[in-house]
Regions:
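Glycine-rich, phosphate-binding/catalytic loops in enzymes
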Residues: 98-100, 198-200, 227
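Short, surface-exposed linear patches
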Residues: 102-106, 185, 203-205, 231-232
């Protein structure tokens, strides 16, 4: 990308958009956004595997922006498979204001037990630890954690594919298409199926590199969406034994 770290894959709009409601919070602090669709998009078949950032902006307020990250899962065989830590992104996500899996803004001590759920159906707001950078709003932890390694790997010419935590949970065959799984920086929240799939692949010869700290620390349990019934749209942390 000539040092730019990425390239423009496409653009669209403008779109007519209204104010979407902030969903009510359940007893487990779960907020699920059952919003009206402003626009939809089908990923073209010729797009390569990668981590993409859709940047949303307002035509009436220049400079107001937010990202929407998404992963195009690898379909081809690659030497390396970089897994983004999207479950950890959501665990620390404080959208709409203070509601991460750790706290609700009511006290100085973080909660580390069970019985708190977070939904994947909500935007990424401010990340509740380490970094407060308005220009990264909406990107989860990607620009903080994954991007520096991805930038370097692609600049060095490595053969890289990409997947999300959710891909590893739902599709063990994603590991059949690579020689090595790479976990980056802060990959804290894993499901049992993720762990079992990675372990089975390792026993079959897959290499696994954890270029990270605090990895595979919390086991989670997935739940179906309370609004659509779609599987694996919310999760809770299991109690540490």
């Amino acid at each position: 990308y000539n040092g730019a770290g990425g390239r423009l894959a496409g653009s669209g709009g403008p779109f007519s958009a209204g104010t979407q409601p902030v969903p009510m919070m359940t007893v487990e602090r779960l907020r699920t956004c059952d919003w009206d669709i402003t626009a939809d998009f089908t990923i073209p078949d010729d797009w390569c595997s990668g981590i993409y950032l859709a940047k949303l902006g307002r035509t009436d307020k220049p400079g107001w922006q937010s990202y929407v990250p998404f992963v195009v899962k690898t379909r081809e065989a690659t030497d390396l498979l970089v897994q983004v830590s999207d479950l950890t992104w959501q665990a620390y996500n404080k959208w709409p204001a203070n509601d991460s899996i750790y706290d609700d803004g009511s006290g100085p001590v973080w909660y580390s037990g069970p019985n708190v759920r977070v939904s994947l159906d909500r935007p990424f707001a401010r990340y509740c630890q380490i970094l407060d950078a308005p220009l990264s709003i909406g990107s989860g932890e990607f620009l903080l954690w994954e991007h520096p390694l991805v930038f370097w790997l692609e600049a060095q010419g490595y053969d890289v594919g990409y997947c999300s935590n959710l891909d590893l949970h739902l599709d063990s065959k994603v590991l059949d298409r690579t020689k090595a799984l790479v976990s980056v920086a802060h990959d804290e929240y894993w499901s049992r199926d993720m762990f079992d799939n990675a372990l089975a692949a390792r026993e079959d010869g897959l290499s696994i590199a954890f270029l990270s700290g605090n990895a595979v620390y919390h086991e989670i349990e997935f739940y179906d969406s309370e609004t659509t019934g779609e599987p694996c749209r919310a999760f809770a942390r299991r109690e540490l034994m």
